[in-house]
Each structure stands twice: as structure tokens, then as C-alpha cells.
Amino acid sequence: MGRVIVITSGKGGVGKTTTTANIGAALAKQGKNVCVVDMDIGLRNLDILMGLENRVVYNLVDVIEGTCKVKQALVKDKKLPTLSLLPAAQTRDKTAVNADQVKELVTDLKAMFDFVLVDCPAGIESGFQNSIAGADEAVVVVTPEMSSVRDADRIIGLLEARKNELDSYRLVINRIKPDLVNANQMMNIDDICEILSGELLGIVPDDEDVVVSTNKGEPLSLTANKSAGQAYRNIAKRIQGEDVPLMDIKGKGFFGKLKAIFS
């Protein structure tokens, strides 16, 4: 059986869907059979980031409603034969499915793939509850901004309330700017991890090539010699249990201010 990993954030706009696409592509490139699932019903974007928007015929809601079989809805990646996408419905809303239905679906996918990555919609309402149903573990994506860290803290509280169902959660800190960290103008990695009491899965530096790759529908993790791409490849290796060193980014100065916000 495979592993189901929900990728969540709480706050929108932190790069959660980009993270899902890049980790999925990296895992597939490293030889794993991977399915990425877009749970943002009504606002799907994962197909665009993967360059598969013109190949979508059926979607997740069609599978749950019995309109098609799950294999009919899966869209194979054009370059990576072991990577598949299960797209969200674009013309429905989050009430079209419930947590029990999603749990049954991801259980079926676990039997078909080594890894199932569920791209969770922003927020803590029904879309979040549906997305974590059946997940084995969670990845919380956060940026070094106070609002993002506070929202992630809320999400982690909800994940910890389901610790009997989830094995673990780990953090991916996205859009780090080393120069600002070292100049004490951006929250530092240790401070974020201490506030969120989470294990660090990876650090992704801010990289303008992410925008370019998104517009081209080509995950950056497939591109050699790009710092963010290498970061995603390292995250994929850590997910598989490899001991890969983290980037060395230092910086001090924010924690006293932050403790007042989170206390």
C-alpha cells in the first residue's frame, strides 16, 4: 500500500499547489509511482501547473458520483509515465463531496500508487476536512511571514486533534530569501520551527524561475541547476527516508516580537 500525504497551509498564496506539483514530479522522476490529487473543487489549478489542462476529461467528483472509473479520470503526465493527476471539478463546489467519500477514494488510490499527494484548498472549512480524510501524514507549507505562520499554527492545531489518524506532520518553509534572513529582515528558520513545534521537511528559496515554470506548465523540480528545483528534489528524497542535509540559512532578531503574537 502507498502513502497518502496531504499538503496544506491554512493561508492561500504560500505556494502549496506549486509544492504539490514539484514534489510529485520529483518523486516520479526518482522512480516512484505517484498520483497528485487536486481537492480544490471549483478552483482547480494543479492541472495548469503540470501542463495537463487540455487533457482533462473526467474529474474527482465524476469518480465519486460514479460517472466514471478512477482510472478513466487519471491524467498521465506527458513526460513522466509514473506521474498521474486526478483533477478537481471546475464547475462544482466543495459540497459536492464529503469526507467519507474522499477517504474511500484515496484508499483506492493507495492500492495503485506508491505516493498519493493531496493538494488541500486554503482555509479550515469543509475542503480542508475532506482533504485530510484518509491521509497518513501532512506537509504544512508556510512562508516566513507572520500571517502565514499564524495560519499554519491554526492548521497544525487541527492536525494534532486528529493524531490518532495522522502519523505525523512536517513543515516546508517556502520563499526564503537568505539575504533578508541574514540581515534580520525576515523570520528565521529556527524561530518558525520553534513557534510551530514541527519537524522541518525542507526549505525552498525564493526563485523567480518558479513563476516561469508555472506559466510553462513544467515543474521546476525537473530542471537541473535551479536552487528551488533542487530543494524540491531534496524534499522528495527526505519523504522517502533519505538523510539529505538542509540548506544552511542563518538569521536572528524576530523571535521576541513573534512570541507576543503566538502566546
Region spans (language model):
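Short, amphipathic alpha-helical "lid/cap" segments that border enzyme active or binding sites
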Residues: 21, 229-236
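Flexible glycine-/small-residue-rich
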Residues: 9, 38, 87-90, 120, ...
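Walker A/P-loop NTP-binding active-site region of P-loop NTPases
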Residues: 4-67, 115
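Conserved beta-strand scaffold positions in the cores of enzyme catalytic domains, especially
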Residues: 4, 85, 200-203
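P-loop/Walker-type NTP enzyme "switch/lid" segment
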Residues: 39-111, 214-215, 221
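C-terminal boundary of histidine-terminating zinc-finger modules
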Residues: 216-230
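P-loop NTP-binding site
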Residues: 199, 218, 234-263
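Conserved catalytic-core segment of NTP-binding enzymes
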Residues: 101-104, 108-111, 115, 121-206, ...
